[in-house]
Amino acid sequence: MISNNRLRIAMQKTGRLSDDSKDLLTRCGIKINLHKQKLIAFAENMPIDVMCVRDDDIPGLVMDKVVDIGIIGENVLEEEVLNRQVQLDNCSYTKLKRLDFGICRLSLAVPINIEYNNIHCLNHTRIATSYPHLLKRYCDKKKLTFKSCMLNGSVEVAPRAGLSDAICDLVSTGATLEANGLREVEVIFFSKACVICKTGFISLEKKNVIDKLMTRIQGVIKARESKYIMLHAPIEKLEKVMNLLHGAENPTILKLAGDNTRVAMHMVSSETLFWETMEKLKLLGASSILVLPIEKMME
């Protein structure tokens, strides 16, 4: 049985967000033994319990206050909000943080042999989807009349099977659409993974754990977005070197032993350092340029 004194987190058991969610908790220093056979896992070093469930159950578990925190895709979250609004059910939650994984878009796609000029080409058509409420909201805004064909999987095969004229489904790279003779024509919703929290009373003990967890999550994301840069540069070119390194904090500048014309620069940059930038740095006289990943970061 899950203790009321421990923070309860719901995450996807298997699927698109599962591995990234597990990796996030691990990088946050939470020691937890997650198995596919287990519904609940208990952290060893923090008062945290993790429930591994279907992704479309997570919003409801948070909104019904069964768990305190959920890691979920915004597409699933928004679909459940719209569903609960129709059912006149509670759909309250607090979004704590958008994450840096689970990036996708919900799009309309049509067979490649169909002429498409604008959204009204889909008027009075049948559209297959796993997201009927998001689709309806978008089509209502566009004043589009359509018939929904609800499918819980393999939506991309619906036109070829004669079930629909078009589909509304998640797209990451577009490779699945192309493999099934479809092309993306409209994006109706952009989505990333996010951390959500229940509304209402939360004990001080749990609030402290949430604050600690969110600080660590922010540190993990910041570290993944940043690089540690070290280089040697001519003193007279320092300003030009800094101008090339957009997104970098004020550098640490150190004297080089036996060289009064050059210094060592150490800095954290929040932007990707491309080969072209490194080549420009070299033209300015920089040398020994190192770009290193950052494992952990706290501001």
Curated annotation (Swiss-Prot):
Feedback inhibited by histidine. Its EC number is 2.4.2.17. Its main location: cytoplasm. It is found in: Cytoplasm. Pathway: Amino-acid biosynthesis; L-histidine biosynthesis; L-histidine from 5-phospho-alpha-D-ribose 1-diphosphate: step 1/9. It catalyses: 1-(5-phospho-beta-D-ribosyl)-ATP + diphosphate = 5-phospho-alpha-D-ribose 1-diphosphate + ATP. It is an enzyme of class 2 (transferase). Keywords: Amino-acid biosynthesis, ATP-binding, Cytoplasm, Glycosyltransferase, Histidine biosynthesis, Magnesium, Metal-binding, Nucleotide-binding, Transferase. Pfam families: HisG, HisG_C. One of its GO terms (biological process) is L-histidine biosynthetic process. It comes from the Bacteria. Its cofactor is Mg(2+). PANTHER family: ATP PHOSPHORIBOSYLTRANSFERASE, ATP PHOSPHORIBOSYLTRANSFERASE ATP-PRTASE. Catalyzes the condensation of ATP and 5-phosphoribose 1-diphosphate to form N'-(5'-phosphoribosyl)-ATP (PR-ATP). Has a crucial role in the pathway because the rate of histidine biosynthesis seems to be controlled primarily by regulation of HisG enzymatic activity. Belongs to the ATP phosphoribosyltransferase family. Long subfamily. This is ATP phosphoribosyltransferase. The lineage of its organism: Bacteria, Pseudomonadati, Pseudomonadota, Gammaproteobacteria, Enterobacterales. The gene is hisG.
